[in-house]
Amino acid sequence: MKEGKYKKAEKYYDSIFEGIETESLPMPDLNGKAPEKGYLEKTMGLKEEAILSYCEKLGVTPNILFTGLFGILMAKYSNAEDSLFSTIYNGRNDSRLENTVCMLVKTLPVYCKFDPKTTVQAYMAELSEQMLSSMANDIFPFSDICAKYGLNSDLTFAYQAELSDDYPIGDTIARGHDLSLDMAKMPLLIQVREYNHTYVLTAEYRSDMYSQAFIDGILDSYEAAMSSALKTKLVSEISVI
């Protein structure tokens, strides 16, 4: 009997996440009594041309580069050689959905690992393969992934390309308005947003768990890691200061 797509997808996720006990959410530096939302943003000084050129050299997309760098940063924050977090993607892995108007965004788990001799290129290539395979097997939902492997979305990274607050409709421009919740969606959400060829880091976080200075340090470390990655061969050589 032919194996169903759901079971095949489950076996794929087994091959990546079964038995993993990595905890990458940074230890809180605060212990507030009531959950509160914090928000920070930082414009990165790196030029788009340098990022795109580096992506071409590695043979990966900007999404993989930025996501992979976050994995490295979280591993270093945990003093480990691996990291575990979640990400999102548009859910449009079928060409028939290209022009469909609906909410298809899905959450995926991400597992990053390296050793002292792992090159940045090999690390990014492996992550790219994992991400493409995870998207291809997204019939196995994140809720089932969490239930089976004990994962969660407490630590999430997202790359948002070419964002705009203005939307042309005929001869007019519709102005977008932020309708964010007044509570953080998870303890820590880091995003890279691209506006007019400039990369902006944003952090949405539980301010009862993390101080502004702590989160600001993470954003500074992320930019430092990217600057370092552009000039190094090995993952272990990437500096976050």
Language model: regions and residue ranges:
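Short, well-ordered beta-strand elements
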Residues: 199-207
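Short amphipathic alpha-helices and their capping loops
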Residues: 1-38
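A short N-terminal helical cap/helix-turn-helix that marks the beginning
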Residues: 16-23, 134-140, 144-146, 214-241
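AMP-binding/adenylate-forming domain of the ANL superfamily
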Residues: 7-8, 35-53, 121-125, 179-200, ...
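His-Asp-centered acyl/peptidyl-transfer active-site segments
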Residues: 1-10, 37, 55-63, 67, ...
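Conserved catalytic core of two-component histidine kinases
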Residues: 29, 192, 203
